[in-house]
């Protein structure tokens, strides 16, 4: 099994990586929305149903005040007749009108509930499908994609972006329909009551638009600055938290606090101005709206005196004026939601459209058993075409041999492992396993032949038994325990509370680094892969633990072709072949004794480490 790291910094400061910022805009709004619409194509019938139910719900809701006007008129007329002594209030008629109005609002609520339930289902199915496709996509992505991005950036596609898309989709679709329907329906009702009063009330719209655009124009730059410096604040906090010991050791507390205070002051100023300006919007809108109500009340009163309209119509009209501004504000909010939704969908589809590595090949080689022959034939490789780091690398490895790859940092040691497991393909030459070019294998079958133990171990939240069994999921408890014994891990496991059933926490911090490595070695022993890769597996533990790990590794490597990458040359003195790499080339090869006798680069490297240890 290929081991991974326990924890890797997710963002540039070691934080959770970059998610969606509030109000972030897409690079291509139209294309992003078109892709999302096509993606939602399988739910078109449900979306049409949502549109119908939302529109009908709005129609019932908008009709309510106009119907209520009849009850108000009947009440006013009845009071007039009662005062004049010519009649009384017709409560039967008023009750019928009220019951009919109640029925309208109940129908509106029922249709609204149904469309909300359908839309929520569409949204959650879309989010589920997206997360599933992203999860499957991750397993088909080439290694170069993940090495050029932080974990947090990839994870934010599954969490932040999909959540943002889901929330925006759920709200925006229904709000667009209801807002437009409410706007049109309210306008029709207002005109049906009084064209003059409608014109008077509409005068407030351009005034409101001018004031709102003025506020938005001046507050937007402060909102941008607020978001920018909020990011700086988060970055500084993460940076100081992650490097707390270094800050303390170098007595940099004062400079760190000063830097934070400067950034915090800028954030305070921008946040104060942005919140103040945005806070002005509501009272200004209320003031302008109240002016509209005054105009409607005066004109309505004059029309009522002339007998053109009744008091009920004036009351209904005022309610429509109040309702008329709400959909306009909602449409403005929807515009922002659409921007966020488009930006989130753009990032998700950008990931889903990334180039995948080929997992299968035509006429693939299938081997029932891998012996462990490995041949490197004039291999050359570069991460970029103009940056070749391995040049003309050749070596022949027979089954059961221990091959050590040594050299300074950047020599290309780890790159050789990535090529061997086809995380990357060679630029030139070929790598063969049992006489077959590894490019002729399906990637999964090829990687099944390899086991890997890294210095930075990967253990997941779960029991120790489950973590070891990850090497071979169908293994019995007895086989897991035997693997732990072979890895010299059985003794320390028994001393832990719960033994093999002890739960490791999320970071596996409730066991030591050496114990983590022994557990991953046990996992590799259980997997029983014919070829092993040991990458700096003992470079971060004490000498006593290193001896125990080395014994476990000896058991693991017995009878298997093993590639050992280590900076500590004392750990690979018994290797059958040592390949000395420098600047991507093999400059020396041989056994430990042969290389020391040559008194070349390896001898200098070994002696320098010996002197350091001394």
Question: Locations of the language-model features?
Answer:
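Helix-loop-helix
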Residues: 189-203, 273-346, 351-352
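Juxtamembrane loop-to-helix connectors within ABC transporter transmembrane domains
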Residues: 18, 22, 32, 40, ...
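ABC-type nucleotide-binding domain
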Residues: 360-361, 367-614
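Transmembrane helix-loop-helix hairpins at lipid-water interfaces of multipass membrane proteins
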Residues: 29, 47-111, 192-196, 307-311
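An intracellular "coupling" helix at the cytosolic face of ABC transporter transmembrane type-1 domains
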Residues: 143-144, 162-169, 173, 181, ...
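Hydrophobic alpha-helical transmembrane segments of ABC transporter permease domains
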Residues: 41, 99, 111, 115, ...
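Transmembrane helices of ABC transporter permease
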Residues: 42, 46-59, 70, 171-225, ...
């Amino acid at each position: 099994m290929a081991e991974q790291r326990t924890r890797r910094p997710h963002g540039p400061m070691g934080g959770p990586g970059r998610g969606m910022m509030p109000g972030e805009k897409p690079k291509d709004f139209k294309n992003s929305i078109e892709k999302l619409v096509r993606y939602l194509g399988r739910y078109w019938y449900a979306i049409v149903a949502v549109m119908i139910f939302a529109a009908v719900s709005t129609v019932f809701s908008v009709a309510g005040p106009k119907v209520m006007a009849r009850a108000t008129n009947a009440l006013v007329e009845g009071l007039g007749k009662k005062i004049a002594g010519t009649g009384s209030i017709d409560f039967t008629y008023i009750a019928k009108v009220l019951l009919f109005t109640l029925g309208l609002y109940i129908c509106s609520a029922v249709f609204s509930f149904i469309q909300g339930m359908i839309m929520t289902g569409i949204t959650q199915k879309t989010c589920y499908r997206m997360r599933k496709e992203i999860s499957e996509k991750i397993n088909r992505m080439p290694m170069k994609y993940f090495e050029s991005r932080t974990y947090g950036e990839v994870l934010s596609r599954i969490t932040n972006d999909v959540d943002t898309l889901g929330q925006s989709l759920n709200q925006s679709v229904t709000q667009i329909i209801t807002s437009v329907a409410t706007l049109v329906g309210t306008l029709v009702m207002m005109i049906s009551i009084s064209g003059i009063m409608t014109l008077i009330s509409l005068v407030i719209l351009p005034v409101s638009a001018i004031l709102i655009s003025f506020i938005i124009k001046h507050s937007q730059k402060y909102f941008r600055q607020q978001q920018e410096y909020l990011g700086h604040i988060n970055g500084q906090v993460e940076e100081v938290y992650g490097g707390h010991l270094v800050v303390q050791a170098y007595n940099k507390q004062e400079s760190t606090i000063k830097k934070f205070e400067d950034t915090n002051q800028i954030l305070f100023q921008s946040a104060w101005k942005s919140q103040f300006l945005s806070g002005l919007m509501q009272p200004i809108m209320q003031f302008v709206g109240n002016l509209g109500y005054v105009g409607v009340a005066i004109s309505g009163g004059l029309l009522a005196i002339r007998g053109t309209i009744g008091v009920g119509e004036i009351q209904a009209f005022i309610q429509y004026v109040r309702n008329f501004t709400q959909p306009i504000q909602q449409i403005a909010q929807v515009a922002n939601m659409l921007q966020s939704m488009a930006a989130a969908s753009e990032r998700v589809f950008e990931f889903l459209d990334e180039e995948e590595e080929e997992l299968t090949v035509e006429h693939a080689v299938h081997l029932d058993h891998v012996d462990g022959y490995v041949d490197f034939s004039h291999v050359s490789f570069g991460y970029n075409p103009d940056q070749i780091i391995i040049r003309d690398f050749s070596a022949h490895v027979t089954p059961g041999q221990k091959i050590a790859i040594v050299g300074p940092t950047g020599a290309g040691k780890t790159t050789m492992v990535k090529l061997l497991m086809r995380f990357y393909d060679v630029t030139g030459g070929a790598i063969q396993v049992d006489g077959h070019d590894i490019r002729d294998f399906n990637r999964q079958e090829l990687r099944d032949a390899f086991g890997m133990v890294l210095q930075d171990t990967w253990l997941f939240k779960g029991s120790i038994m489950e973590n070891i069994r990850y090497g071979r999921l169908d293994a019995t408890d007895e086989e897991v325990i035997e693997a732990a014994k072979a890895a010299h891990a059985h003794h320390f496991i028994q001393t832990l509370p719960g033994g093999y059933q002890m739960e490791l926490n999320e970071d596996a911090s409730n066991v030591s680094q050496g114990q983590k490595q022994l557990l991953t070695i046990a996992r590799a022993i259980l997997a029983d892969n014919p070829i092993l890769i040991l990458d700096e597996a003992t470079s971060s533990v004490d000498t006593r633990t290193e001896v125990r790990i080395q014994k476990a590794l000896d058991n693991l490597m017995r009878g298997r072709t093993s590639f050992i990458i280590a900076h500590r040359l004392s750990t690979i003195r018994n290797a059958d072949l040592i390949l000395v790499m420098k600047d991507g080339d093999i400059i020396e090869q041989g056994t430990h004794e042969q290389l020391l006798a040559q008194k070349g680069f390896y001898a200098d490297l070994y002696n320098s480490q010996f002197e350091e240890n001394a």
